[in-house]
Structures are given as C-alpha cells and as structure tokens.
A protein has these predicted regions:
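Nucleic acid-machinery interaction/catalytic patches
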Residues: 1-474
Length: 474
C-alpha cells in the first residue's frame, strides 16, 4: 500500500494509465463488482472521464466520483466513523458559512446609522456597508443597497473562511507530544483563542526588495505605505477574528475532532481491519485543480493503508518548481540596475553589469524564468508540482513514474509544446512558419459576446471535421 504518482504532459496518457491500473489481476472474482473511486477536480472532468471510459470499455458503471480531495476525505470519515450524524454536522459547506455570516452581520444593519462603537471589531466592515448606501436618499433604496452589500460580503467571507480552513488551520511541523503548535501559518489556532495575529512579523517587517540600495527617502516612503497597509490589515484581521471566534471556531474544532477520531481507528491494530473493509482498496486522483498541503498530507497518511494513484498533468518533464515569471524578472532586473545608477551616477556599463552579477548571486535572486508561457500562466501548476515532487524521494514507500512521450506534430503548436516539455526558452526565428499552419489561431474580438460567438463557430467547425479514424458521416 502506497502512493503511486504518474505524471505526463498528455491527458490521454494519464487516461491509459488509469485504465491499466483498474485492470489489475485479482484472485477474487467479486473484486470486479466493487465500486471504483475517482477524485476529479470538476464536474466537467467527471463527464469527460465517463465518456472516455465508456468508449474504451463499452460501458461506464459502478464508479463513484468525488469532487476534489475534500469530498473523498469526508466520504472516508462517513464510512469509517459510527456516529454518522456527528460527521454530517461537522462538514460545513460554503453555502452554510455564507448564510450564517449573513445572519450575524444583519443584526447590526437595522438602525439608520452604524450602532457599533469605534473600538468594536466589526465597526469597519459594518461602516463599509453603511457607506455603500449613504448617497441614496430613499430609505427603501438604502435598505436594499445594504442588503445587497451584505450578501456580497457574506459571499466573500465564505470564500475566505473556506480557504482558511484548508490553508490556515493546520500544523505542518513535527511537535513533541503535548507541545502546542507555533506555526505562523496556523491562523485559526490563534483566532480560536481570540488572539490577534502578529501582522508585523508576517507582513510588515520592512524587508526591502533591494537591500543596501534604498535611500533614506525611499525607505521613509516604504515605511509610510507600510503603516497605511498595516492599519487596513489590522481592521481586516479584527473583524474576521471576531466573526471566526464567535461563529465558526466550535465547528472547526469539531471538524478536527472528526479527523482525530478517524486516524485513531485507522492507526489502532484492533480496529483497522474493520475500517479498511469500509474503504476502497484503491482511489485514483485524476489531475488536480487545487492541492492544499493538509489534503496532500491526508492522502500520504491514507496511502499507508490503501493504494492511492495520483495522475498528475505536468506540461514539462524538467524541474521547474523554482522558476519565476519572465516579466517579473525583467522588471526586477531593470529596477535593480536603476537603483544602482541612482546611487552611483558616474558608474560605467561594465561596473553596472559587474554589480548586477554579484548582487543577484549574493541575495539569491538568480532564478530562471525559462519558458515564458509556462512561468507566466502556470503558477498554480508550479506550486502543485513543488508539493508533489517531495514524494519523489520515496521516504514512505511512494512510487514516482514519468510518462513523457516526445513525439509532436510538425506545426507551431507542436513546437511550443516541445519547448515547454524541455523547458527551453523560445528563440526568434527557430521555427519556419507555414502559411497553411492553423494550429494556433488568434481572434481579435470587440466584446465578450463576440468572443463566445467566435468560439461557437470554431467548435462547430472542429466537430464537423471528424478524424481519420472516425470520419464524419453526413
């Protein structure tokens, strides 16, 4: 039992690997009747997989799809733990967070003016809702405007708190038994105790982007901007902390208790066998849209007891977890050289270049930008890769497999894909352009509606063409 990661730049290769993994020989003929479990990033991928599996196998049945890792996580809790009602209540979807936030804040919006004192944690957010309707003369219009603003705020809070529960509510260090978590990223632990975050340490420690080059005036300006941003951040932190501590902390503690109960059963030798009988022997993660470290840690721990197959879409076979946006690096380099010229007006070009090479090496800013399309539009995929690449060491028995076919068609799109695969920076004039090459098309549209119309026309054209293997029948 372990985690097996297969990565490829082609979705069809990942599909074939999934089919191969689902046809492992078994001595028990009834294994074929058991439900197969798949974790997919969206309903669209689920529909695509269902169609492709039907094409390859003639039928798609007895398969259970889970929308993202979180859904499978709560499925496992529900299957293993006996108190089903407790598990059901502990799982709080975003819709519940939104309406509970709406009800809490609504009580402070009934008066004609903000009823809260200036030192109340909610004063800033309630005042913002009142200000949104301050220019309206009609009382009815003001009330409708405040309700609309309150609904928008509640929607944003539900997004924030859902992300906090995934990214800001867990301890990622190995602590001794009984030792409290001191992770700076574990915000919800501090908020649960109604303790404010150390914003100075996390965000406003005055770490200049160009050490040793900023003048006194530039440092003073940065400090002034930092003070304003800090004041705004403190107001945000105050009302979010108050709302979390009052309304959602107890629910989050219950969620963490559910996780503790689950692993207590899985880790105990006497209860493990009965729990494993309620779980699938294998779960397949088909590509990822988001990958919170806490959910990856759940899969790694679960991989000690069942097979976890991760099919990861990776456009490049090279290591690119440390790449940066090419535009960002260019702007940074230009600003760096300009700061040096401002401080040393008489410096020659050779002195500027010598300083630039020494400075970038000394402060660790010599990062590669590599292929601009990948580094600019693939930041989230880069972060996912940097998390998954930790599994390549196989410390807990994880297996890693690369499937990167290098055959590409001889057109412009194939050239771009090949460069991204090998993380090669594009060179001007490296590809002979063919006027008949329509692999990449650029349409300039005057509105979003026109974009949809062009997209519809193109999809209709592509669907009407068919292929060599499956020609379109009139």
């Amino acid at each position: 039992m372990a985690i097996h990661v297969i990565q490829s730049q082609r979705i069809e290769v990942l599909l074939q690997e999934m089919l191969r993994a689902g046809h492992q020989p078994s001595a028990n003929p009834f294994e074929a009747l058991k439900t197969q479990h798949f974790i997919v990033p969206s309903a669209a991928v689920q529909a695509w997989l269902t169609v492709r599996l039907s094409e390859h196998q003639g039928i798609s049945a007895n398969r259970l799809f889970h929308q993202r890792i979180r859904a499978f996580q709560w499925f496992a809790y529900q299957a293993v733990l006996d108190n089903k009602e407790k598990v059901r209540k502990a799982n709080i979807p975003r819709m519940i967070i939104k309406w509970r936030t709406y009800q809490v804040l609504k009580a402070f919006l009934q008066a004609a003016e903000n009823p809260l004192a200036l030192d109340h944690p909610l004063h800033s957010i309630i005042q913002r809702i009142y200000d949104s309707a301050s220019r309206l003369s009609s009382g009815t219009e003001q009330q409708l405007k405040k309700q609309g603003m309150l609904y928008w705020v509640s929607e944003q809070v539900s997004r924030l708190f859902s992300n906090y529960m995934e990214y800001r509510g867990h301890c990622f260090k190995q602590h001794a038994a009984g030792q409290a978590c001191d992770c700076s990223s574990n915000w919800l632990k501090d908020w649960g105790q109604n303790q404010p975050l150390d914003l100075d340490q996390q965000f406003f420690s005055m770490q200049t982007a160009f050490p040793g080059l900023d003048s006194k005036e530039q440092l003073a300006q940065q400090r002034q901007v930092s003070d304003f941003a800090k004041d705004q951040a403190e107001k945000l932190e105050q009302w979010q902390r108050w709302l979390w501590h009052r309304e959602f902390h107890a629910d989050f503690e219950l969620m963490q208790g559910i996780d503790d109960d689950f692993w207590a059963i899985m880790d105990h030798p006497e209860t493990r066998a009965a729990a494993l009988a309620k779980l699938p022997k294998q779960v397949t993660l088909f590509t990822v849209l988001d990958l919170p470290p806490s959910q990856l840690a759940f899969l790694r721990r679960l991989g000690q007891y069942i097979d976890v197959l991760i099919l990861h879409f990776n456009p490049s076979q090279e290591y690119w977890a440390d790449t940066v946006d090419a535009n960002w690096k260019k702007q940074y380099d230009v600003k760096l050289k300009q700061r040096f010229k401002d401080k040393h007006p008489q410096a020659s070009d050779q002195e500027i270049e010598a300083f630039f090479e020494k400075y970038t090496l000394e402060y660790g800013q010599m990062k590669e930008s590599r292929h601009p399309l990948l580094t600019r539009f693939g930041k989230q995929a880069r972060d996912h890769f940097s998390l998954l690449v930790n599994l390549a060491a196989g410390e807990n028995g994880e297996e890693w497999e690369d499937q990167f076919p290098a055959d590409y068609q001889d057109h412009l799109l194939g050239k771009v894909q090949y460069d991204i695969l090998n993380l090669a920076e594009p060179e001007q004039g490296s590809f002979a352009f063919n006027e008949q090459d329509d692999s990449v098309r650029i349409h300039v549209c005057h509105s979003a509606l026109r974009q949809l119309e062009v997209l519809k026309d193109q999809l209709t054209y592509w669907l009407s063409q068919g292929s060599g293997e499956r020609p379109r029948s009139p």
